[in-house]
Swiss-Prot record:
GO terms for cellular component: host cell endoplasmic reticulum-Golgi intermediate compartment membrane; membrane; viral envelope; virion membrane. Signal peptide: none annotated. Keywords: Cleavage on pair of basic residues, Fusion of virus membrane with host endosomal membrane, Fusion of virus membrane with host membrane, Glycoprotein, Host membrane, Host-virus interaction, Membrane, Viral attachment to host cell, Viral envelope protein, Viral penetration into host cytoplasm, Virion, Virulence, Virus endocytosis by host, Virus entry into host cell. It comes from Avian infectious bronchitis virus (strain UK/123/82). This is Spike glycoprotein. S1 attaches the virion to the cell membrane by interacting with cell receptors, initiating the infection. S2 is a class I viral fusion protein. Under the current model, the protein has at least 3 conformational states: pre-fusion native state, pre-hairpin intermediate state, and post-fusion hairpin state. During viral and target cell membrane fusion, the coiled coil regions (heptad repeats) assume a trimer-of-hairpins structure, positioning the fusion peptide in close proximity to the C-terminal region of the ectodomain. The formation of this structure appears to drive apposition and subsequent fusion of viral and target cell membranes. Homotrimer; each monomer consists of a S1 and a S2 subunit. The resulting peplomers protrude from the virus surface as spikes. Residues 1-520 are extracellular.
Length: 520
């Protein structure tokens, strides 16, 4: 039934006429996701004869249903519905318009008729024109991967020899909605046939009823116990940590600079300023030690004179205050305070330049044309080459990260675990109520191991005290379904699951709705 959001549909080929009885067969599609849409035509009407609206999927089947009364084949309500199988598109539309630009995909369609078409690489390769007397209103379009089948109002209107998942689908409409999109997964089904017609269907969907029926290949059971196996698909993983928090101290690389006492003056121009103690940061945390600058005098920027660092909003004394960079390189040089910094930045020797005076001799040559042979006061020039980013960060002290660990333990299903460093698969149950009165895990122990070395019982400190958990095998070889009065009423298992009741040396889990699925 396409109109039930928690429902399923079952298709079988008309040539499939098995003998009377139960038969395991493909062709069932179960709803796994539902969404609705009220309208997607922004103008006074939708555009017929064209595909204007689509939603992306990756599904075995997608069903698009209108309200049960259906929608009129009119641009005031419904225009086009389509199924996209990646390589080609199947769509149903109408278009009784002759104006220029109308019906771009189909051309004029006769009045009171609809068109079912298939298109590949912008070329139509299938066309079927049907009178609306057969389909008075649009009610549903379902796209199915098996043989790329398309069903209009429940009738098969297109199929091919390919099987492909649905990649997109949509309904373009103005009113009469909402349209409900149902994404479906393919499951096997056990169907009961009478005279070649399916009368009853049980989905092999992992539910208790599906497990029982599809394993025994029948839907009719007398009262009794029925052993069964169920291979669990592990989808979840959790970690139980030894410590509630872990502190990690990150290394800080230190670059310490010092005065160069035997530095030679430049001989004219910035390219003759020799570089010393070049230090380049790659990534991580860094500290730049310029303590020797305390005996130098910082020179502010004054036109050609002094420092020049408009691209660096910091002084060297504050470079360690958590600043972030991508590449960062620092060098020392000795050159003229007059023009040495500004011209070095202009000629791309550095991004920024900081000038310091130490009352040096006037032995440095000029850096500008016409001043290359003139002598100026020598000073200390600190060159910084950088771009902003996040790979490098400066720090005044080592940096400590604190990681807080939270133990979110997944119960009552097969999971992958990492418990205090031991890994494996298991079915975890809470046994605190059974272990609280016994001397489990004495002397501060955290886990009890079985003979194979795997974890059997482990303890976790909870908000209100210690909690004990048992690791069971994912597959219970002793589990049995219980049938009473022809209905599935419970499960006998050797595992103490949440909500189970002790029954001698086993546990009983009651099934509230154990009746088999019936055809809707």
């Amino acid at each position: 039934n396409l109109f039930g959001n928690n429902s399923y549909v079952y298709y079988y080929q008309s040539a499939f006429r098995p003998p009377n009885g139960w038969h395991l067969h493909g062709g069932a599609y179960e709803v796994v996701n539902v969404s609705t849409e009220s309208s997607n035509a922004g103008t006074t009407e939708c555009t017929a004869g064209a595909i204007y609206w689509s939603k992306n999927f990756s599904a075995a089947s997608v069903a698009m249903t209108a309200p049960q009364n259906g929608m009129l084949w009119s641009t005031a309500q419904f225009c086009t519905a389509h199924c996209n199988f990646t390589d080609f598109v199947v769509f149903v539309t109408h278009c009784y318009k002759s104006a220029s630009g109308s019906c771009p995909l189909t051309g004029l369609i006769p009045q009171y008729h609809i068109r079912i078409s298939a298109m590949k690489n912008s070329s139509l390769f299938y066309n079927l024109t049907v009178a609306v007397t057969k389909y008075p209103r649009f009610k549903s379009l379902q796209c199915v991967n098996n043989m790329t089948s398309v069903y209009l109002n429940g009738d098969l209107v297109f199929t091919s020899n390919e099987t492909k998942d649905v990649s997109a689908a949509g309904v373009h409409f103005k009113a009469g909605g909402p349209i409900t999109y149902k994404v479906m997964r393919e499951v096997k089904a056990l169907a009961y046939f009478v005279n070649g017609t399916a009368q009853d269907v049980i989905l092999c969907d992992g539910s208790p009823t599906g497990l029982l029926a599809c394993q025994y290949n029948t839907g009719n059971f007398s009262d009794g116990f029925y052993p069964f196996t169920n291979s669990s698909l592990v989808k979840e993983k959790f970690i139980v940590y030894r410590e509630s928090s872990v502190n990690t101290t990150l290394d800080v690389t230190n670059f310490t600079f010092s005065n160069v006492s035997n530095a030679t003056p430049n001989t004219g121009g910035v390219h003759t300023i020799q570089l010393y103690q070049t230090s380049t940061a790659q990534s991580g945390y860094y500290n730049f030690n310029f303590s020797f600058l305390s005996s130098f005098i910082y020179k502010e920027s004054d036109y050609m004179y002094g420092s020049y660092h408009p691209s660096c909003k910091f002084r060297l004394e504050t470079i360690n205050n958590g600043l972030x960079f991508n590449p960062l390189s620092v060098s020392l040089g000795y050159g003229p305070i007059q023009g040495g910094c500004k011209q070095s930045v202009f000629e791309n020797r550095a991004t920024c330049c900081y000038a310091y005076s130490y009352n040096g001799p006037p032995l440095c040559k000029g850096v500008y044309r016409g001043e290359l042979t003139k002598s100026f006061e020598c000073g200390l020039l600190v060159f910084v080459t950088k771009t902003d980013g996040s790979r490098i960060q400066t720090r005044n002290e080592p940096f400590t990260l604190t990681q807080h660990n939270y133990n979110n333990i997944t119960l009552d299903r097969c999971v992958e675990y990492n418990i205090y460093g031991r890994v494996g698969q298991g079915f975890i149950t809470n046994v605190t109520n059974y272990a609280i009165n016994y001397n489990y895990l004495a002397d501060g122990g955290m886990a009890i191991l079985d003979t194979s070395g795997a974890i059997d019982i482990f303890v976790v400190q909870g908000e209100y005290g210690l909690n004990y958990y048992k690791v069971n095998p994912c597959e219970d070889v002793n589990q049995q379904f219980v049938v009473s009065g022809g209905k599935l009423v419970g499960i006998l298992t050797s595992r103490n699951e949440t909500g189970s009741q002790p029954l001698e040396n086993q546990f009983y889990i009651k099934i509230i709705n154990g009746t088999r699925r019936s055809r809707r």
